[in-house]
From Swiss-Prot:
It comes from the Eukaryota. GO terms for molecular function: NADH dehydrogenase (ubiquinone) activity. Disulfide bonds: none annotated. Belongs to the complex I 30 kDa subunit family. It is found in: Mitochondrion inner membrane. Gene3D superfamilies: NADH:ubiquinone oxidoreductase, 30kDa subunit. One of its GO terms (cellular component) is mitochondrial inner membrane. Pfam families: Complex1_30kDa. Its EC number is 7.1.1.2. This is NADH-ubiquinone oxidoreductase subunit 9. Keywords: Electron transport, Membrane, Mitochondrion, Mitochondrion inner membrane, NAD, Oxidoreductase, Respiratory chain, Translocase, Transport, Ubiquinone.
Length: 209
């Protein structure tokens, strides 16, 4: 190779930026994939809206095992329970999307959303197919408050839970306002008294116009 060819090769390679290798080879945490692969396990992600957010569907009996894995694995231990809620899918058809094919006819479906600081990813788990789910408060302290709101609004119950009193409604209240069968219009309503700091379940009076 001549001197001019060597100089030209060095000049051309000097302007090329070397691509950085991705910090994590797999997009979805492989520890979770191998752990739940024998279950009815499915996950989705969107590279258009938010590429670091995954949605997973698991049977309800996997809730306690899920928390133990999230708290014990090296790259999953640095995680935070961001949100916990529920959805009443009673009467929901499969035409709403592929995700609901796994969730339909399950009544109330729980949803737990975690953020993993080391992986920089957010994963939302839907737990379906059961009325009772093991509590996550032994692994995440804020699960105590969030699960109490779910059980109060959606008539759910958590196993191994230390505190199950109502937060938003009066103690001893047996109605669940967020269920689809709750008569939200026409017959009854929940009224909050700001002076007495109490809530009341009262019958609505029909008015003719």
């Amino acid at each position: 190779m001549s001197l001019n060819q060597i100089q030209r090769a060095c000049f051309c390679s000097g302007g090329v930026k070397k691509k950085k290798k991705p910090k994590y080879r797999f997009g979805f945490p492989m520890a979770l994939y191998f752990f739940f692969e024998k279950l009815n396990f499915s996950y989705w992600t969107s590279t258009t809206v938010n590429p670091n957010h995954y949605v997973c569907v698991l049977p309800s009996e996997a809730g306690q095992a899920l928390a133990s894995v999230l708290g014990g694995e090296l790259f999953l231990a640095k995680s935070q329970l961001v949100e916990a809620t529920a959805f009443d899918l009673t009467g929901q058809g499969a035409e709403a999307g592929d995700l609901l094919v796994f969730l339909r006819n399950n009544g109330v479906v729980l949803s737990y959303s975690f953020y993993f600081f080391l992986l920089k990813k957010r994963i939302t788990f839907f737990l379906h197919g059961g009325d009772k789910v093991s509590s996550l408060e032994s692994f995440y302290s804020n699960a105590n408050w969030l699960e109490r709101e779910i059980s109060e609004m959606f008539r759910g119950s958590n196993l191994l839970k230390k505190e199950s009193r109502n937060l938003l409604l009066d103690y001893g209240s047996s109605f669940n306002p967020f269920l689809k069968k709750f008569p939200s219009t026409g017959h009854a309503e929940v009224v909050f008294n700001s002076f007495l700091k109490t809530t009341a379940y009262v019958q609505t009076a029909g008015v003719e116009l």
